[in-house]
């Protein structure tokens, strides 16, 4: 009985200890560090936003494109000068209407035409020293489509009405040339010359040399040969002069005459002999030796 009273007394005693309170959160230096990092993050976000707006302003970003680059329904449109650091692949490149299209490079500009297997078919290279074209055939045509120049492995064709060579040394052909007409400009000389080799002119239907307003000269160092195998050689002129024919020896008798007769040796050589009452060719046969 006393034990039960003690238990009851213990249960009815008022408790002097209150309930325990646990604080949850960040306090002290941890809280200050957190606020510092949040503030730093906000500053970085503002700087990033400002830099983004500045880049958009400098690069001129718009709804249609960026800077001089415009995106249209037909493709890309570039205004002003453009620089490509890597190869450019395009189906068509054209300038604005009324403006020229320029290609500039510090070294060269190369244009390649490829097939389906990416093999180069034709190539155009414009360098600082030369313009080179690679291909099976090279053609130059007018706006109407008329052929002006063509070149391939077999032949070179000039389709213009006239081919003019303005060089001081003329034109050098290391091999033969075929043409229906060789003509100089009006009031200009036409000279056909072979300094170290022979000059041969051939035609199946004849060769005509005509000088309508001037003289015609044929000069050689050794022999000048006129040969007709099946026909004849005609010298048709009002005056024919042979000023340097050799003269046979003669004995002056009476008055000295200035009239000579033309004699022909058996070997075809011509010489002059002073005319007399009769033929004097037999007297000067020593010239034929």
Swiss-Prot record:
Protein name: Delta-sarcoglycan
Similarity annotation: Belongs to the sarcoglycan beta/delta/gamma/zeta family.
Bilayer topology: Single-pass type II membrane protein
Signal peptide: none
Disulfide bridge partners, by residue number: 263-288, 265-281
Places the protein is found: Cell membrane, Sarcolemma; Cytoplasm, Cytoskeleton
Statement: the UniProt record of this protein carries the keyword Secreted: no
PTM statement from Swiss-Prot or TrEMBL: Disulfide bonds are present.
Organism: Mesocricetus auratus (Golden hamster)
